[in-house]
Amino acid sequence: LNQMGLPFPTSLLITPSTMYDLAFQLPRMAAVLTRSAKLGAYSRLNKSHCVLILGWAGSDDKSVKKYADLYENRGLDTIRFTSQMKAFSPKGLSHMRDMDEIFPLLDQVENKRLVMHIFSMNGVYSLVSLLHHKKYAYLFSKTDGIIWDSCPIDSKLLPYLLGYNQVINNVHKKTLESGTLFDKIGFMGGKMVFLSSAVMEAMRQWIHVSTGGNRSEVNPYYYVRDHPQLPDKHTFFYSTTDVLCQAPPIQSFHEYLTEKRKMEVEANCFTDSPHVKHFPLHPMEYNQGIDRMLTCVDRFYNPNSKL
């Protein structure tokens, strides 16, 4: 029975993701569509395009909005959304994140093409969940470029778990610092549920591949990398000092796109910026990367563009 004397629904008792959510009591972040009122360098592109921004785990709307502002000041509409972290589901890629909040906003820009800005693996999981939704499976076919910040990675199990442990600690820093003993016990229980689900997910992927299955069917890194409708233009921002999403798998990802899939790739690898902190430390390079992506898209749709 809960505190009101009512029984918990049976489904809540058997779902690792629900156990994680109950332990951490995570708030849902609203998805936001902003119509740019600015007359910027890319206002003409705004007639045909919108920027979709998927945030990193633990980010608040204020932090993600700073990146939306970069596009809105250039004259472009944006949709921004950060999905909740959740325990891994045995249902696989289609249930990695709950994306219902963003559906009505995507419907409002249904007639526009997209440029995507993806942050960390939480953004990748959000993207993969969207692509597995029947109504939005086409999103890559209407996307002209993707900017990747601190992602994507395909980590080995141990660094994978260590990275997630750090992410969870960062997300729930206040609980660790000032929570009651009961809060901290609940936190540890929730974290164990999450990390256990990550181990089970790694085992599920290993069994799938070992029995002849394609890893792109179970692993988001390869699902995106090998997706037949993946757009041709990509910009990467990552760092050799990022301990959460380390540089080697990101480098392997963009090199594969360049060498095997013959796509247009710009890679910006820094040596001093931590996870999702490349813009604060390297604002000039970051803005230039955004401009080059948007200019490339603009010239394709507006051949007479002087940008």
Predicted features by range, described:
Residues 84-108:
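Catalytic nucleophile-loop/oxyanion-hole region of alpha/beta-hydrolase
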Residues 145-156:
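Active-site nucleophile loop of the alpha/beta-hydrolase fold
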Residues 281-307:
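Catalytic active-site module of serine/aspartate enzymes centered on a nucleophile-bearing elbow/loop
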Residues 126-135:
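Short glycine-enriched nucleophile-adjacent loop
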